[in-house]
């Protein structure tokens, strides 16, 4: 990977809405070079998607997020990959990580309601033959996600004094 690719990835990670013209100026390369480099990174699977960071608390959309620690038995000749693939195919699962430590996989999951999320864990996830245990942690509040701070800049930070 060359320096231009690394520079573009760093810039796009911060703001993927920047026009090609601005990216060309920021990197000191021609518009054509930048466009071709980005196109090649998309074709090669380096850039998979452009997506915003959304503060869902400021919308009417109800949703429940959780992180689930999963202990599994790895499969012969496939290790954790086959188990992870089976799990990441569930619609509720947004992210899957292979972890070191007390558990094997960490899932970031999302459902519309607590009941839906509980149903997912009890009937879909924990019933898989390779899953030996789970621990579910519900997200109560987001402070930062993908490098973006979820702070209300207009919030009154004075302490409330009651008589």
Task: Give the predicted meaning of each segment.
Residues 1-163:
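A compositional/biophysical signature of low hydrophobicity enriched in polar/charged and small residues
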